[in-house]
Amino acid sequence: MSSRPLESPPPYRPDEFKPNHYAPSNDIYGGEMHVRPMLSQPAYSFYPEDEILHFYKWTSPPGVIRILSMLIIVMCIAIFTCVASTLAWDRGYGTSLLGGSIGYPYGGSGFGSYGSGYGYSYGYGYGYGGYTDPRAAKGFMLAMAAFCFIAALVIFVTSVIRSEMSRTRRYYLSVIIVSAILGIMVFIATIVYIMGVNPTAQSSGSLYGSQIYALCNQFYTPAATGLYVDQYLYHYCVVDPQEAIAIVLGFMIIVAFALIIFFAVKTRRKMDRYDKSNILWDKEHIYDEQPPNVEEWVKNVSAGTQDVPSPPSDYVERVDSPMAYSSNGKVNDKRFYPESSYKSTPVPEVVQELPLTSPVDDFRQPRYSSSGNFETPSKRAPAKGRAAKSKRTEQDHYETDYTTGGESCDELEEDWIREYPPITSDQQRQLYKRNFDTGLQEYKSLQSELDEINKELSRLDKELDDYREESEEYMAAADEYNRLKQVKGSADYKSKKNHCKQLKSKLSHIKKMVGDYDRQKT
């Protein structure tokens, strides 16, 4: 008995099947056997159609983008508040500080008259000598905060209201481009803002370096108390706490835009790899609540079927437990379910008299007939025709190809143990090795056939988004898409898929037996 828990068989991982684990002992072939390295499986070998991406969750990549955009909105408001609170101290200087006829109102310094000798400094941006105007730097910072606020608000609103535009790859490409541009501009604005609010940081490279340093040096060295301090000059030379907070928030916005780019790229890659039917943009509530009045319904049904012979005691267990049925719909040969226990007593009347509109149908459970076979609700492929593409039904979000007993419990493991018991000799190991190679080739051939259908469906799904719905290209692609969906829903496809999973379980068991034998020898 294997120690593996009762669950689905492990996914086939090519890197685990290394040839050196299955090579024969050196004492048989003298160490001269060379095995060709095994190539990796195709990208769709892990059944991507079985995986569902829950993009409505806040922890998913689109959800993280929503969170980051919300944080950018808050940080932009904080930057606007911090920068705007320091604008009042800029009215005492500006263009007249380093060039103009008025001069800075710092009594007796003569700094304004000195600046007038060098000519007029530009009031917006940069003047002579590479000097950065604080008002221009703050205006640049406020403008970028406003642009980032608008962009983040658009991203947040379009994703929260779950618009169709926000569910396309083109939308996330736009998010990447806008985030990259705004991130670069915010970085430039933050650097310019640092130079504007900290004049000593730019004084070394400007013509007014010595004058700026002489004016601001008094605030950087300890001075006697009681002296008059000009508040305008103080706020010009010293970085205020609000300005420091704005600088930090500016760099945090840059990091937030970088993270948005990362998760937008991740979202586009997932949308390219998986089919649209595998992505859930809205939360579904199918199995959250139990159907109403189930007990009352059961009582009514029981009252109407009193003269029907009672089924055997283990019949309910066999119906309720999917482990009692194999993939072809027949009962497995499990020891505690012999054929005589359920073929001797007819029970189909109970099932046939149930109303078709019963609440149990909402569960989409298999319906069993008298022969022991079961019927599963048919899945409708999403129609892609001349009209707009219909949305995927709620039931199609969930895999209706149930994993039955032959695939999910340890019955199949017991079958493999009976067919491939633990290895006791090198000759038996070689036999297992040959069976493994044969099964592996069959698995790879069968898997590649299934992969071609999945990849072709994914390619056609992307093409349908690019074509105009009434064009000939769209109609041709839609016909091919619907044909492949019918092929994928056929019994032959499901049979091959189940056989592929059984081969995967067989290869995993053989690998375990060989590994156990090699560990015992060592």
Curated annotation (Swiss-Prot):
Q: How is it modified after translation?
A: Dephosphorylated by PTPRJ.
The record's section on InterPro entries has: ELL/occludin, Marvel, MFS_trans_sf, Occludin, Occludin_ELL
Comment on protein domains: The C-terminal is cytoplasmic and is important for interaction with ZO-1. Sufficient for the tight junction localization. Involved in the regulation of the permeability barrier function of the tight junction.
Task: Give the protein name, as stated in the record.
Answer: Occludin
**Mainly resides where?**
membrane
Q: Which residue ranges traverse the bilayer? A: 67-87, 141-161, 175-195, 245-265
Q: Residues in domain MARVEL?
A: 60-269
- Describe the task this protein carries out: May play a role in the formation and regulation of the tight junction (TJ) paracellular permeability barrier.
Q: Compositional bias (Basic residues) spans?
A: 381-390
Q: Which residues lie on this side of the membrane: Cytoplasmic?
A: 1-66, 162-174, 266-522
Q: Top-down, what is the taxonomic lineage of the species of origin?
A: Eukaryota, Metazoa, Chordata, Craniata, Vertebrata
Q: Which family does it belong to?
A: Belongs to the ELL/occludin family.
Intervals, Extracellular compartment: 88-140, 196-244
